[in-house]
Amino acid sequence: RGLGAPDCIILPGTKNTVDDLLWLRQSGLEAAILKLAERGTPILGVCGGYQMLGQTLDDPTGSESGRQQTLRGLGLLPTRTVFSEQKRRVQVKATVAAAPFAGAELEGYEIHTGVTEAEGEPFAHYPDGGREGCVQGNVFGTYLHGLFDTGTLTEALAGWLCRRKGIDPSDAALIPMEEYRRQQFDILADGVRGALDMDAVYAAMGMEKR
């Protein structure tokens, strides 16, 4: 199965890293991703996607997959993940360390099982100086959800991808996630108003039409 010529590949989080890794492998998508990574296509793995990008995924108690096993990862990052029954749930702030996004401020959360040991360069640093995630060449991995909510990483990533294609980043119209959400809620509200008899709604509520 081919993926065409994407500007970037994002492997998202998953409810079951092991099962979805096996599906990637069996479907042929793993081979396609590896081929594109070798050609220099940027790969970003988030949470379970980050775990998949590593060398091995060890499930010693069967807490993730239902049986004891060690799986080969995609091998694109120098990391090893060991699953456990404990789940990490935490709100975090971090600063991206990885070029070309260095300096982007992040505010998000982690929610995952497993501990990942990384030997490569970190994707980001916590305020206390702790390392988060891993980077190797054009492959990036992080446990942080909400990467694109603050907008700074979104702008940095979009600008970098534009420059790789010879496009002026100033031509890319970007809006903060919160503003985008408000716009979508306004569109939804307008759609609801257009589909309802608002006079009847206000009358039923004992309110005057605004």
What name fits each language-model region?
Residues 15-98, 102-107:
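Cysteine-nucleophile active-site neighborhood
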Residues 3-12:
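Terminal amphipathic helices with adjacent charged low-complexity linkers/tails
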Residues 9, 47, 145:
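Residue-level signal for inorganic ion chemistry
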